[in-house]
C-alpha cells in the first residue's frame, strides 16, 4: 500500500507509466475511476433499492464513487509477471475484506502452459474475461455477484492452470483451478476447496461458446455449479458494430445454507440459477471528440433459491453510452434499472424498483 501512495503524484501524467527497474524488470501503473449519480423514481425506495413502508426520511438521489482502482503490473521476466490491484472506492463503505482485489503471480511457459497463484478471478464465465470498465452495461450481472458470493466468480484465493490451442479447426481455451472457496482477503476456515474449470470454443471468428463447471466442499458440504455462455461480435462496416452476450448458470447456494442458524434441510435443496442476455449496437465516429455511441439492453432472470421459497428477480437495463476516447478510456453512461420481483417483500431490497443511473468513467 505504501508503494502505491508514494507513486500517486506520477499517475496523472500518462496512461500506464513504465518504470525500468532492471534490464529485465519493468513496472506499469494504471488506474480507473467510476463515479455515479443514482436517482430513485419511487418515493418509497431509497438509492440502495431498500423499500420503506413508514414515513421516515430517505435519500432518493446521491452522488458516489463506485470504483477508484489503481493497478501495478510488474513484468519480472519474459515468463513471470506479478499484478496488484486495489480499489480505494471500497473505503466509501465498509472496507472489511475488500480494497485488495488482484494480488497474483503468473508464470507463462507458452500458449499451452500457464500457471497463476494468489488472489484473482477464477475462469467461470464470460464476465471473468474483462474488467468492469469494459462491461457493456452499468455493471456486472446480478448472476455474477451471486455466484461470486458463493466463491465461483469474483476475486478468490488459489491457483490455476490455463492455456489455449489456436492452430486447429476449432480453437480451444482451457482453465482449471483450486481455490479456498471463502472469497477474497480471508483466511480459509476449513480443509475444503473448490475446483472450477472452463472451456471456450472458437466456433468462428465472431462466435465463442463457453462451458464452465466445478465441484468442491465447503464446511464439509458438497457443492457444485455449472454454466454455459455464448458470445457473438461482428463489425458490420466502418461505423456499425453489433455484439450479443448470453449466459446461464446453476448451482448450490451454500451462502444461503450457512446463513441459517440451524440448517435442517440438506444443502442440495439450496439451489440458484440465472440467465441474462445482453445485445449491444455501436456506432463509431471519425475525426471527432466523440468516438462511439452504443445502445445496450440487458435482460436478466435470477432466482437465488428456486427449489424452495425462491423470489425470482427480473432486471431490465436499457443503457446509452458515449465514449470520448479509445477503449472506453473516457465514457459516459446513462441507464434505467428496473427490477421486478416475483413477490414484493416490504422493508427489504426484494421490492420492485426503478432507478436512473448516470456513470462517468476514466481509465488512465
Regions found by a protein language model. Give the residues of each.
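Short, well-ordered amphipathic alpha-helices
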Residues: 14-15, 159-163, 199, 228-233, ...
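Outer-membrane beta-barrel "beta-signal"
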Residues: 351-364
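Bacterial Sec-dependent N-terminal signal peptides
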Residues: 1-17
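Sequence/structural signature of outer-membrane beta-barrel proteins
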Residues: 36-42, 87-93, 124, 179-185, ...
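C-terminal closing repeat unit and adjoining cap/tail of repeat-based domains
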Residues: 319-335
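Outer membrane beta-barrel
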Residues: 18-42, 57-181, 191-193, 200-208, ...
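Detector for outer-membrane/organellar transmembrane beta-barrel domains
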Residues: 48-49, 202-305, 314
Amino acid at each position: 500500500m505504501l508503494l502505491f501512495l508514494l507513486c500517486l503524484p506520477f499517475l496523472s501524467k500518462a496512461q500506464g507509466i513504465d518504470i525500468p527497474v532492471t534490464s529485465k524488470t519493468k513496472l506499469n501503473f494504471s488506474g480507473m475511476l467510476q463515479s455515479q449519480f443514482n436517482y430513485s423514481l419511487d418515493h418509497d425506495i431509497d438509492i440502495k433499492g431498500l423499500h420503506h413502508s413508514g414515513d421516515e426520511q430517505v435519500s432518493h438521489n446521491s452522488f458516489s464513487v463506485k470504483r477508484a482502482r489503481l493497478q501495478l503490473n510488474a513484468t519480472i521476466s519474459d515468463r513471470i509477471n506479478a499484478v496488484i490491484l486495489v480499489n480505494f472506492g471500497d473505503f466509501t463503505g465498509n472496507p472489511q475484506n475488500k480494497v485488495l482485489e488482484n494480488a497474483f503471480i503468473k508464470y507463462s511457459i507458452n500458449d499451452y502452459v500457464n500457471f497463476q497463484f494468489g488472489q484473482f478471478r477464477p475462469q467461470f464465465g464470460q464476465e471473468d474475461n474483462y474488467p468492469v470498465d469494459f462491461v457493456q452495461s452499468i455493471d456486472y450481472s446480478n448472476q455474477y455477484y451471486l455466484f461470486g458470493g458463493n466463491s465461483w466468480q469474483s476475486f478468490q484465493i488459489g491457483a490455476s492452470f490455463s492455456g489455449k490451442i489456436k492452430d486447429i479447426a476449432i480453437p480451444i481455451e482451457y482453465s482449471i483451478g483450486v481455490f479456498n472457496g471463502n472469497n477474497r482477503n480471508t483466511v480459509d476456515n476449513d480443509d475444503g476447496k473448490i475446483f472450477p474449470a472452463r472451456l471456450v470454443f472458437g466456433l468462428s471468428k465472431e462466435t465463442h461458446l463457453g462451458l464452465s463447471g466445478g465441484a468442491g466442499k465447503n464446511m464439509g458440504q458438497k457443492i457444485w455449479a455449472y454454466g454455459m455462455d455464448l458470445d457473438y461480435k461482428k463489425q458490420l462496416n466502418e461505423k456499425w458494430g453489433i455484439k450479443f452476450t448470453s449466459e446461464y448458470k446453476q448451482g448450490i447456494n451454500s451462502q444461503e445454507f450457512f446463513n441459517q442458524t440451524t440448517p435442517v434441510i440438506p444443502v442440495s435443496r439450496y439451489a440458484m440459477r440465472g440467465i441474462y442476455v445482453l445485445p449491444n449496437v455501436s456506432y463509431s465516429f471519425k475525426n471527432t471528440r466523440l468516438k462511439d455511441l452504443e445502445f445496450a439492453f440487458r435482460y436478466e432472470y435470477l432466482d437465488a433459491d428456486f427449489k424452495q421459497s425462491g423470489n425470482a428477480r427480473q432486471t431490465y437495463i436499457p443503457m446509452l453510452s458515449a465514449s470520448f476516447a479509445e477503449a472506453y478510456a473516457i465514457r459516459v453512461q446513462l441507464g434505467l434499472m428496473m427490477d421486478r420481483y416475483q413477490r414484493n417483500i416490504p422493508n427489504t431490497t426484494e421490492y420492485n424498483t426503478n432507478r436512473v443511473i448516470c456513470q462517468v468513467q476514466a481509465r488512465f
